[in-house]
Amino acid sequence: MCGIVGYAGKRSAQDVLLDGLEKLEYRGYDSAGVALAQEGGIRVVKSKGRLDALRQKLAVQALAESSCGIGHTRWATHGEPSDVNSHPHSTPRVSIVHNGIIENYGALKERLAARGYTFESETDTEVLVKLIDSCYHGEPLQALHEALGMVRGSYALAVLFKDFPDTIFAVKKESPLIVGWGEGENFVASDIPALLKYPRDYSVLEEGDLAVVTAQGIRFYNAFGEPVERQRLTADWDQEAAEKGGYPHFMLKEINEQPAAITATVSPRVEDGMPDLRIPELTDERLRSIGTVHLVACGTAMHAGMVGKAAIETLARVPAEVDIASEFRYRDPILNKDDLVIIISQSGETSDTLAALKLAKSRGVPVLAIVNVVGSSIARAADYILYTYAGPEIAVASTKAYVVQMCVLYLFALRLAYARGKLEEAETKRLTAELLRAGEVIKPRLDDCEQIKYLASRFVNTQSCFFIGRGFDYALSLEGSLKLKEISYVHSDAYAAGELKHGTISLITDGVPVIALATQKQVYEKTISNAKETKSRGARVILFTTKDAVVPEGVADYIVRLDEYEDLLMPLQLIVPLQLFAYYMAVLRGCDVDKPRNLAKSVTVE
């Protein structure tokens, strides 16, 4: 959730750190700070609030030039947002920034207090830096090994020692951390976008790794303190992809990038008109042996999993289950050796999802990961990988990553159905061709947004909103509702339309907007009937349906018409106006679209 940046080299460390932290703002934060190695000691400057507040403090203090330092954006877990709780935390000899949670910090704090240490903040990180200080006798590696041996929890650390002013010590346990390779300069970061302005080569720290980073090079040690080598990767995202490119917000840019993201993700996986997963080990024979598919994810990725479940069961007639990752890992799921667990995560670092993956593997069940970041923790741990090629997604609210997650799940469902003899080759090719043109299908929704803007202006002051739908439309109701409440702060709930009479309809009051999704022909009349029920109780109904659908008079106040498209694939088109509705509602309400309050892009702690 928090952001870490470290730099050792020839440039101004302060400038590099601030630039890197700005690139990590999408991860969410409530305070920020830097520690700079200078002659005579380590200078720490930190501030509650946005990076601008930190910049102002730095400008006033006018620190001496430094070429080595660490920086941090904090999302509060222990201790409220404040200057004193912000990172870095320091002693006269050691300064650290930390992502993660130290579970036994209370017991460690008592032990350190008995030795004379005092504490100013409420954070687990202050306990950790003083624990490291208590173990330091001139050898940083020894101090870190001894201190971290007493710690229970997760952490990504960047550490400065006063006695080693040109060196950053980076340590990783259950929280993501990478190091970047430059020429006469090297970097530490919690995510790739912080490095895109600089040389693109990076290495991912593995579990228990410690990296010693100087301007001259990087050395790696494993959890046992043994020197090791780590694979050097190259980021294929360009810097412009992580910029707004003329759009007022990253979210709007990323919504408009969806056609290109679909093409980039689907096209390489189609061979002679047939879906080809490009995973040699996942043969048709292996696909035929699958018992149950378990789709596990959090938030928006879980909503993509719901679409995947429906596609898998509809096309391949294989039972599929969808689980919220944080529930899956604690409910003792029934898993069999012939099952397949599909893990879905944009970042590849989502804490609960990674834990669910580890649970599946501990039961001997193979795992297929759908992720957007090469070399991420989930990608490295999975048996099979399907990368989505969305490029960097900076806005906290996911849009293009969600769409390509659905695309990959459609490809998987199509290949699974063909391998198991549930789809003939001709029908498989037809549906694959329809999927290939999805980018073309959604483009008109992006080119003409006036109706959606108008609807947002009509309902900008609403206090509550309800989404209803059936089948695929219900899965889209959940995602549309989530987008609206994430970024516009309007209370919103989504329900299976058939559940209205089981309690939900009591919430319908005069003037409340109900967004009814009715794109599925099989259940169209049922959904229309449900929409009419809400209308008769005073709701203002916004109906999303297809151009050819016959809408009875008096059902809806507003109708948004979509192009005719394959029912199975309609979520790819329907989601676009729902994303845009949430976006324009947020803009009109004056909300921070890209960085909504209290939310983080990558949830790397439980």
Language model features with spans:
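A SIS-like phosphosugar-recognition module
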Residues: D163-F164, S175-L177, E183, Y202-G246, ...
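Conserved short alpha-helical segments that host acidic/polar catalytic motifs at enzyme active sites
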Residues: M1-K244, P248-H249, E257-T292, Y330, ...
